[in-house]
């Protein structure tokens, strides 16, 4: 395929135009009066959302040069979502403003490398000031405030998340799922989460969120590494006949075995996800046994005379109501009404408590306490309902955003919301030292860019940006901000309008990182447009027209 190359000013112009297209679509969602975006789906009704990263990821521009710019800012939103779980719209708005201002300096003939150095110093100083003015989350009400703001002012969502955290602890496991009715409920069930994710991203069932979600799966627990597929065949065929998915937790899965599982998963012969077992050595064996008790299964281990190739039915497999696997974590949710499992879990907890009493090692005691907490605290499930499927999905998105923001707040604290944390932090730049005038230009660019979130929130609320910015510039109270919901100036902390420090910090860092890359780019290589309209137009099917029944599994 032939390529086209664009250089210099024309290159940056196209990239900036692409960034601006995405930023305009994402920016309208910011703040309490931000608007929703309707995203066409390949099937079913459109997705209605105010989630910045969902909007960004849905954008694919026809013009390939513009699309390069779009992908730059989509990467900002994605990275911020991965690290902080929220703040994607703020990051996008800042990145757009930073790229435009840095480009003006470049066009004016200023040494862009020195400008970048000055801007980098400014970003570091602002982040230090934001951290300095951060306050820890002290109580349930503050957790509710963070969740309320992040869910677009939905107080019910804020209170439900605060209630869930109260029941399972601030570091407890909370999941979000669809309710079977109109209601929004919190339910605490038996379950656990451990710090191991899927072995390959090809196991992800939700490509947008890159997670695997299984309802009522079987769980195969192996105290061994699996490299060849043959020992797995009997149990895989037994599970395939039931039509249920399989979660395979083992020391490791690689080679032929991993390839076969991925192939059959993609083919649809069996829904499966492979996960590495948590822990190491003897602790790994104990944690596998914990999972076995929770799921009413058995650990397949040759130490007990159980060989994998002899497992040809589902009798030794565990079960769960739901399993969610990300690249980093696995969460198992079980039915709290199963009295047999309840008794076994309570007995196991008692064994762990006795072990805690007997150990003299602080490290061992800490690890035992972690295991006890995983078994004892359970999982809080936020069940989100709605009058229609579209309404339910939109609300579920807001609940997930609010949950991410709340976790970020617990981790690093909170700052005044509404964009004022960055706005007031920019004042430290007035006394920031610089090596030359070009660096001062970079510092001033960041100072101007930090107005962008406030301006976007005011704009979305139908207010006058310059008037609000001018009013806040006079304020000596760093908590004073503009409440876009009431169109009044208020003490943001007292009004409960707060942002997680981690979200604010990450948004600025990621936005500047991408803006720096864009401004350092002087050439762009893309496919020729006409090449996309050529190619094989034959009507033949893929793979030689194989049409079997289910076709069995590929081993």
From Swiss-Prot:
From its record, what is one biological process in GO terms? protein refolding
Q: InterPro entries, per this entry?
A: Chaperonin_Cpn60_CS, Cpn60/GroEL, Cpn60/GroEL/TCP-1, GroEL-like_apical_dom_sf, GROEL-like_equatorial_sf, TCP-1-like_intermed_sf
Signal peptide region: none
Q: Which residues bind ATP?
A: 29-32, 50, 86-90, 418, 499
- Catalyzed chemical reaction(s): ATP + H2O + a folded polypeptide = ADP + phosphate + an unfolded polypeptide
Answer yes or no on keyword Isomerase.
yes
Q: Which UniProt keywords apply?
A: ATP-binding, Chaperone, Cytoplasm, Isomerase, Nucleotide-binding
What Enzyme Commission number does this protein have? 5.6.1.7
- The answer to whether the entry has keyword Isomerase is yes
Q: Offer an example of a GO molecular function term for this protein.
A: isomerase activity
Q: Which GO terms describe its cellular component?
A: cytoplasm
At the top of the EC hierarchy, this enzyme's class is isomerase
A single Pfam family, by name? Cpn60_TCP1
Extract the ranges annotated as region (Disordered).
528-555
Q: Gly residues composition bias: which ranges?
A: 537-555
Query: Where does it primarily localize?
Result: cytoplasm
Segments spanning the bilayer are none
Report the subcellular localization.
Cytoplasm
- Top-level taxonomic group: Bacteria
**Family indicated by similarity:** Belongs to the chaperonin (HSP60) family.
Complex formation: Forms a cylinder of 14 subunits composed of two heptameric rings stacked back-to-back. Interacts with the co-chaperonin GroES.
Q: What does this protein do?
A: Together with its co-chaperonin GroES, plays an essential role in assisting protein folding. The GroEL-GroES system forms a nano-cage that allows encapsulation of the non-native substrate proteins and provides a physical environment optimized to promote and accelerate protein folding.
- What is the official name of this protein in its record? Chaperonin GroEL
What is the organism field in this record?
A: Orientia tsutsugamushi
């Amino acid at each position: 395929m032939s390529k086209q190359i664009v250089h210099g000013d024309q290159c940056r112009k196209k990239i900036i135009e692409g960034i601006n297209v995405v930023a305009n679509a994402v920016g309208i969602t910011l703040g309490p009066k931000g608007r929703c975006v309707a995203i066409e789906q390949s099937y079913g009704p459109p997705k209605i959302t105010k989630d910045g990263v969902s909007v960004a990821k849905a954008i694919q521009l026809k013009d390939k040069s513009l699309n390069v710019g779009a992908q730059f800012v989509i990467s900002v939103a994605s990275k911020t979502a991965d690290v902080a779980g929220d703040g994607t719209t703020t990051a996008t708005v800042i990145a757009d403003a930073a790229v435009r201002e840095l480009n003006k300096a470049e066009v004016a003939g200023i040494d862009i490398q020195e400008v970048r150095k000055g801007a980098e110093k400014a970003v570091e100083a602002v982040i230090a000031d934001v951290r300095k003015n951060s306050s820890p989350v002290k109580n349930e009400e503050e957790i509710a405030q963070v969740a309320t703001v992040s869910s677009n002012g939905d107080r019910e969502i804020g209170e439900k998340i605060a209630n869930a955290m109260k029941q399972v602890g601030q570091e407890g496991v909370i999941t979000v799922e669809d309710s079977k009715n109109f209601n929004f409920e919190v339910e605490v069930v038996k379950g656990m989460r451990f710090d191991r994710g899927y072995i390959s991203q090809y196991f992800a069932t939700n490509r947008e969120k890159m997670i695997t979600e299984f309802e009522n799966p079987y769980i195969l627990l192996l105290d061994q590494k699996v490299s060849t597929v043959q020992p797995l065949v009997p149990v895989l065929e037994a599970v395939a006949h039931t039509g249920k998915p399989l979660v395979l937790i083992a020391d490791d899965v690689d080679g032929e075995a991993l390839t076969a599982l991925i192939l059959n998963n993609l083919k649809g012969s069996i829904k499966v996800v492979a996960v590495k077992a948590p822990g190491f050595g003897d602790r790994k064996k104990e944690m596998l046994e914990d999972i076995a008790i929770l799921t009413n299964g058995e650990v397949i281990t040759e130490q007990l005379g159980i060989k994998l190739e002899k497992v040809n039915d589902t009798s030794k497999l565990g079960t769960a109501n739901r399993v969610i696997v990300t690249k980093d974590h696995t969460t198992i949710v079980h039915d709290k009404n199963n009295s047999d499992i309840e008794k076994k879990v309570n007995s196991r907890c008692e064994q762990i408590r006795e072990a805690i009493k007997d150990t003299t090692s602080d490290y061992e005691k800490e690890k035992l306490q972690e295991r006890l907490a995983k078994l004892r605290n359970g999982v809080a499930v936020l069940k989100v309902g709605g009058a229609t499927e579209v309404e339910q999905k939109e609300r579920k998105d807001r609940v997930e955003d609010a949950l991410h923001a709340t976790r970020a707040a617990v981790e690093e604290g909170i700052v005044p919301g509404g964009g004022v944390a960055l706005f007031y932090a920019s004042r430290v730049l007035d006394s920031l030292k610089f090596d030359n005038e070009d660096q001062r230009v970079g510092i001033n660019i960041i100072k101007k860019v930090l107005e962008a979130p406030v301006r976007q929130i005011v704009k979305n609320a139908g207010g006058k940006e310059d008037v609000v910015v001018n009013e806040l510039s006079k304020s000596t109270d760093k908590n004073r901000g503009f409440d876009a919901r009431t169109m009044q100036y208020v003490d943001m902390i007292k009004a409960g309008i707060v942002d997680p420090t981690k979200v604010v910090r990450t948004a600025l860092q990621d936005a500047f990182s991408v803006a720096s890359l864009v401004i350092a780019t002087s050439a762009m290589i893309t496919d020729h447009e006409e090449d996309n309209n050529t190619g094989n137009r034959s009507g033949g099917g893929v793979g030689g027209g194989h049409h079997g029944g289910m076709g069995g599994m590929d081993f």
